[in-house]
Amino acid sequence: MIRIGQINVLPALFQSVVIPTAVGEEMTCSSTPQIVRDWMAHPPAWFSIRAPHTTVNPTMLRHRGERDAISLAQEIHADALLLDEEKARAEALALGVAVIGTAGVLQRAADQGLIADLKAVHDLLRQAKFHVSEKILNESLARHLAFKQARRDQFRAD
């Protein structure tokens, strides 16, 4: 979200954003794009980093950040957990954690008028080499266009 200039949709959609320490470490390591490291150097008040008290079974997922994110979401009873990796999403859902992907967040933002051109933002994701399938992006865009059409139809009916 930072790399494509859309990080500010998060506080408009969610009261706060909490990430586990492991993800914070990933976002500040030297291999992370400079724009992300700069943002992490001065995060806004709606963003916080917290270590989970417990961790889900480490054999479930190889990636510590995903394990800790699922654990933290359970602990704080998060409304939604932002996860894109398919196996991690399946594991979170199996544990009763609601998930949303980056494409879903961007679609929700577009549905609420926070993003004027969802297709252009999808293009930014592609340019940033974000790992998301064309199928997911196309489905997200189709849902958004259907949402916009339904709103237009509703206004015409009124």
Predicted features by range, described:
Residues 1-80, 86, 90-98, 120, ...:
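Active-site-proximal, substrate-binding regions of enzyme catalytic domains
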Residues 97, 101-147:
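Hydrophobic alpha-helical interaction segments
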